[in-house]
Amino acid sequence: MSNRQVTPRTEGWTQKKDESGKPLLQFAEPKRGKPPQHLVDIDPADRAETIKGLGIPGFRAKQLATHYFTHYTSDPADMTDLPKEGREELAQKALPTLLTEVKRLKTDDGKTIKFLWRLFDGALVESVLMRYSNRITLCISSQAGCGMNCPFCATGQAGLTRNMSAGEIVDQIVRANKVIAEGGLGKARHDDERVNNIVFMGMGEPLANYNKLMSAIRTMVEPQPNGLGMSARNITVSTVGLVPGIKKLADEDLPLTFALSLHAPDDKLRDDLIPVNDKWKVDEALSAAYEYYEKTGRRVSIEYALIKDMNDHVWRAELLAEKLNDFGKGWVHVNPIPLNPTPGSVWTASTPEQTDAFIDTLESLGIPTTLRDTRGKEIDGACGPVSYTHLRAHETRHD
């Protein structure tokens, strides 16, 4: 097995630095105009009053919510239960257009779709829709751009443009459900198919947009017709390690799935790989992750992109297992993520032999481990902070 050590570096772009020479982190969004207020942005209990404030009878709020959350439409032509006169104005006021589709790319026999959306101010975000044998998953964005400045991440190159609103976050799901309902995601298995699994692994750091993130999630789990009626257990929030946000998430009354994008068990490497590690070290992030498990009873996922000769050494697998086992058994699961082979780049796939050795080491030390397969290579179907990796087609237990 190789003991060579490759150092993280940017390729084709220059990482922004602060006055001390460290990678620049952006937690506060730049001042920009706000997207139009949408029904999603209003608490269900307040919608009737808000609608009345627009000069519209309050009972119309439930009708509008039914169209949007159940029929996945904001097109006034579909709302035949509303008076024809004023219907268009009503829809525009309560359900303004938040996402404009720029591009749609398909692969995997139509079972994977990557969407590029333009927001009201021209900012661009992506989401990836994937059909599996037992579920339909949507990988969604929470910010336009990202302020975490990771050297491997295409999203972080331009920095943070702005936070997305709760309406913009949820609208990715509604728009995806509309595509599914229209037969746009391969062969349907039944008439009422919809997205039933959400992963916050698209553009942005979810916990850096905490309030809008939680507002969106509460709309997702709110029963129809006031929300999407999804299961909190089928919503995964992934973070690069914003410890205060992890602790806040643990105190929410929702059994969400939590994933920590770790990618290195030692601070020396992770400081360069994940710049926010300079604020919250590996041990702090793992301690917060364990606290999440203790408070919620929900097993934590550790995301670990295997990068050739950078973080795939057996000794790092041993160190990772040691750190995880220090908290006990049964609380965590590791997901090594294979990269695409990229000749000439430092960000390239580990060899099969090194991948096997890394996983065998973790499993021999009692750490449950699942290697992720890839999905969407042909369309660069990257999903999340690790923008060069691809969300799995199946979770296959390593043999």
Predicted regions and their residues:
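Flexible, acidic/Gly-rich N-terminal and inter-domain linker regions that tether
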Residues: 2-136
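Conserved AdoMet/S-adenosylmethionine-binding subsite of the radical SAM
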Residues: 181-188, 194-361, 365
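A structural preference for short, hydrophobic beta-strand core positions in alpha/beta folds
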Residues: 336, 371-373
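Conserved beta-strand edge residues that scaffold enzyme active sites
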Residues: 65, 376-377
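Canonical Radical SAM [4Fe-4S] cluster-binding loop centered on the CxxxCxxC motif
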Residues: 131-182
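Conserved small/polar residues in nucleotide/adenosyl-binding loops
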Residues: 389-398
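Residue-level detector of anion-binding/catalytic polar loops
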Residues: 368
